[in-house]
């Protein structure tokens, strides 16, 4: 711990006499430096930054002129010198600091303008390890942290977007920066270096295949404030992380009202579900409400899939999210706008489809640029009071499972197709989850119940109600198959499904009463498949 024996008054306004500029991103650099020069501010710079300023006709002192020491080791050592860091860290009102600065010829630096080597961009480009390591900035973060620590006297700029803010203050205060701004810039500086170091740590963890490192860092760039969170009394914001997985975060909002917290959460759930279906093989549509599906279907076209999905629960679909695994086309768009919908999320959209959606000015249309790979790894995070739960993404795909037929009767080809379809869907339903499906479409969904039997009954009840609305004489579950996200702990859930008219069952298995459940299935002529994989979702 450093003990300061005397407190010195922090100047509210501090004149900027000397600025050090060393940037990788040279956007707006020359114009900014020209304004600094107009205030009589001495410019110190390094390498390529110095060359850019000299080319623009600005008087610049190279760092090596200040230090009397050339840059060495391919530029790795340029600013790591007492004559630079003394100028950044010196407390101007401390007599001992002033004496040391005078003794060693250290000039105070009042403004530091630094942005860093593009480490994350280099990592994401697929560069080799050596190139990535060479893009770990050392001198830049050191200067940023030093200037931020000494923000009582030194301003630090780490973002091009802050150039105008600084210039406005210099104009307002006749060449001075206020303590308020210096403190704000210092806070942003530490946010910047923390995120930079977090990215480096994440790369090393990935490179060394350390899935759960001793320290886990989560960083994201502020993207936007939201009107509120899940409820109006909660504040919320959206932060973009380094994850490039296609979805809400990568999406362009082509039209519609501002996205809410719940819109984004639901759209993410919807798109992750629909991504379970290969867009090269089939068209698929998912309808989501409160992060749970109320209808999912495959079809030869998006229109067919949408209409099949809507049949599952058209009441709950009102005011929901529509997710597509293929580009939105004119025919599907024409159907979607017939029902009030909050958000459409798709990998792309045709011009004709966009024109139709434009008729509903409040309807948000999100274009993601692609469909995420359901097999792709990654981490999911859940916050707790005083901690964070981290787990690998549930990237198990039913196509890859070694399915075990455990009943006397094997499922038919059509039943097996529907069983696999239903198990794709049940993966994305809140536990306890039960999904009834027929002809590659859900016909009943039971979600989020404490009892698996209750989930099964709710799914049947909704299917029966929907059949009545459609004028049908029997439940939609007749002739369907059923999927369960976890094993049936007792035979009652399976018996309930059999009474609803199912012909085949897919579930993980693994209960101590599996044999009892198998016998109940055999007694009712059901085919049953064990996946060996559970899909709890909370």
Curated annotation (Swiss-Prot):
UniProt-listed PROSITE patterns: MGS
Question: Which top-rank group of organisms is this from?
Answer: Bacteria
Catalytic activities: (6R)-10-formyltetrahydrofolate + 5-amino-1-(5-phospho-beta-D-ribosyl)imidazole-4-carboxamide = 5-formamido-1-(5-phospho-D-ribosyl)imidazole-4-carboxamide + (6S)-5,6,7,8-tetrahydrofolate; IMP + H2O = 5-formamido-1-(5-phospho-D-ribosyl)imidazole-4-carboxamide
Query: Which segments does the entry list as coiled coil?
Result: none
Per UniProt, the keywords (alphabetical) are: Hydrolase, Multifunctional enzyme, Purine biosynthesis, Transferase
Question: Domain remarks in the entry?
Answer: The IMP cyclohydrolase activity resides in the N-terminal region.
Its protein name is Bifunctional purine biosynthesis protein PurH
Q: Source organism lineage? A: Bacteria, Pseudomonadati, Pseudomonadota, Alphaproteobacteria, Hyphomicrobiales
């Amino acid at each position: 711990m450093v003990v300061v024996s005397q407190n010195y008054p922090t100047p509210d306004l501090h004149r900027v006499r000397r600025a050090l500029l060393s940037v990788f991103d040279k956007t707006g650099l020359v114009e900014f430096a020209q304004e600094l020069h107009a205030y009589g501010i001495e410019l110190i710079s390094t390498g390529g930054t110095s060359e850019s300023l000299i080319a623009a006709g600005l008087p610049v002192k190279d760092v090596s002129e200040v230090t009397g020491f050339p840059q060495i080791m391919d530029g790795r050592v340029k600013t790591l010198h007492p004559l630079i860091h003394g100028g950044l860290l010196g407390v101007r009102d401390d007599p001992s600091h002033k004496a040391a600065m005078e003794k060693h010829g250290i000039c105070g630096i009042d403004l530091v303008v630094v942005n860093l080597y593009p480490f994350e961009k280099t990592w994401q480009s697929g560069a080799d390890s050596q190139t990535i390591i060479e893009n770990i900035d050392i001198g830049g973060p050191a200067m940023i942290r030093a200037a931020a620590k000494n923000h009582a006297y030194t301003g630090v700029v780490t973002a091009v977007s802050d150039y105008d803010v600084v210039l406005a203050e210099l104009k307002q205060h006749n060449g001075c920066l206020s303590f308020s701004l210096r403190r704000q810039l210092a806070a942003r500086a530490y946010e910047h270096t923390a995120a930079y170091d977090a990215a480096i740590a994440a790369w090393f963890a990935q490179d060394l295949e350390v899935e759960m490192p001793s320290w886990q860092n989560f960083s994201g760039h502020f993207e936007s404030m939201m009107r509120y969170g899940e409820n109006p009394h909660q504040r919320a914001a959206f932060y973009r992380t380094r994850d490039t997985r296609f979805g809400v975060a990568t999406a362009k909002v082509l039209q519609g009202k501002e996205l809410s917290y719940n819109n984004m959460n639901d759209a993410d759930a919807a798109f992750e579900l629909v991504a379970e279906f290969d867009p090269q093989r089939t068209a698929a549509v998912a309808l989501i409400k409160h992060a749970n599906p109320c209808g999912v279907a495959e079809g030869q076209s998006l229109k067919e899939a949408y209409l099949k999905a809507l049949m599952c629960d058209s009441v709950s679909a009102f005011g929901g999210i529509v997710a597509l695994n293929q580009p939105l086309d004119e025919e599907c768009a024409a159907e979607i706008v017939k029902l009030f919908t909050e958000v459409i999320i798709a990998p792309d959209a045709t011009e004709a489809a966009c024109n139709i959606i434009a008729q509903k000015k409040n309807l948000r249309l999100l274009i993601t640029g692609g469909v995420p790979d359901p097999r792709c790894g990654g981490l999911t995070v859940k916050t707790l009071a005083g901690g964070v739960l981290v787990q690998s993404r549930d990237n198990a795909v039913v196509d890859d499972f070694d399915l075990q037929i455990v009943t006397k009767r094997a499922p038919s080809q059509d039943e097996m197709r529907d069983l696999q379809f239903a198990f794709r869907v049940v993966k994305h339903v809140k536990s306890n989850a039960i999904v009834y499906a027929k002809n590659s479409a859900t016909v009943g969904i039971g979600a989020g119940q404490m009892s698996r039997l209750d989930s099964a009954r709710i799914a049947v009840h909704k299917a029966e109600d929907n059949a009545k609305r459609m004028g049908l004489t029997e439940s939609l579950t007749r002739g369907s198959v059923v999927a369960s996200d976890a094993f049936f702990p007792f035979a009652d859930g399976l018996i309930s499904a059999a009474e609803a008219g199912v012909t085949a069952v897919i579930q993980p298995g693994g209960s101590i009463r599996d044999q009892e459940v198998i016998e109940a299935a055999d007694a009712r002529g059901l085919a049953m498949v064990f996946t060996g994989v559970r899909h709890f979702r909370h």
